[in-house]
Amino acid sequence: MSLSLIIKWGGQEYTITSLSEEDTVLDLKQSLKGLTGVLPERQKLLGLKMKGKPADDDVKLGALKLKPNTKIMMMGTREESLEDVLGPPPDNDDVINDFDIEEEVVEVENREENLLKISRRVKEYKVEILNPPREGKKLLVLDVDYTLFDHRSCAETGVELMRPYLHEFLTSAYEDYDIVIWSATNMKWIEAKMKELGVSTNANYKITFMLDSAAMITVHTPRRGLIDVKPLGVIWGKFSEYYSKKNTIMFDDIGRNFLMNPQNGLKIRPFMKAHLNRDKDKELLKLTQYLKEIAKLDDFLELNHKHWERYLSKKQGQ
């Protein structure tokens, strides 16, 4: 019986339909070598498990009970990939095509049709609470790709692509904030990334819940047309007894994602080309200090997160 598998690697998806249940994991890796150029010994396939452990190369695919069109994330680097890693990202990358909220000057926040979309998400979107919200804590909402993790570069493990100081940042933030992950991908990829980065299993902090692209809404802007955004109103509507505009901050490398809540968004510098920038990126280290400073406030609406570095410098100079 033939299998249909979808492999995600380097920001792209590859469909494999040439294998059968009698083929092995190694056969799959050989097929992936032909598609991606990554040698089998350098491939790590997330989600291919046998009795709770990564499946060995000689395990037959039929023994893994894979469903049709199962999606598998691959980690791994081409032999010649350093050149690719240091090269420019694709021209159509979201980071390049992003725009400044203030320049767009669109009044979308209070449009009735957008508020209705948020109401539908509040009613229909199912949130799996991983750890209960804590009384008196503020809320930190975090994007994943280019915020916590360089998702375009190639590496043998996710840890190599992790933004520096990630665990220290989350450990410190957890003292004052409930932490929510919100990525514009599907939940399977979010869970796989959080596991690979060691976020979902870290004993020093806990994630309250995670949201995927299904919690986002589409809004219309005069200059840019239809765009997808992350409305914090979905969270506030579902957890109004804990979170509001006054105690929520969101980090994202794409400013348009908080177009519905510009006052609550902080546009973080994107973490790209991890192999080149890993030793010099200090963004999370500085933002750790910023979060600690503003945690003392009762109302975040008096802040302008666009000038967070100026605010931090002023506070530290006192």
Swiss-Prot record:
Main subcellular localisation: nucleus
EC number: 3.1.3.16
Positions of Mg(2+) binding: D143, D145, D253
Gene Ontology CC terms, in alphabetical order: nucleolus; nucleoplasm; nucleus
InterPro entries tied to this protein: FCP1_dom, HAD-like_sf, HAD-SF_hydro_IIID, HAD_sf, Ubiquitin-like_dom, Ubiquitin-like_domsf, UBLCP1
Entry cofactors: Mg(2+)
Domain of life per record: Eukaryota
Localization per record: Nucleus
Keyword Iron-sulfur applies: no
Catalytic activity: O-phospho-L-seryl-[protein] + H2O = L-seryl-[protein] + phosphate; O-phospho-L-threonyl-[protein] + H2O = L-threonyl-[protein] + phosphate
One of the GO biological process terms: regulation of proteasome assembly
Gene Ontology molecular function: any one: metal ion binding
Ubiquitin-like domain ranges (all copies): 3-81
Keyword Metal-binding: yes
Signal peptide location: none
Entry keywords, A to Z: Hydrolase, Magnesium, Metal-binding, Nucleus, Protein phosphatase
Enzyme class, spelled out: hydrolase
Residue stretches making up the FCP1 homology domain: 133-294
Notes concerning its domains: The Ubiquitin-like domain mediates interaction with proteasomes.
Reported function: Dephosphorylates 26S nuclear proteasomes, thereby decreasing their proteolytic activity. Recruited to the 19S regulatory particle of the 26S proteasome where it dephosphorylates 19S component PSMC2 which impairs PSMC2 ATPase activity and disrupts 26S proteasome assembly. Has also been reported to stimulate the proteolytic activity of the 26S proteasome.
Protein name: Ubiquitin-like domain-containing CTD phosphatase 1
Record organism: Gallus gallus
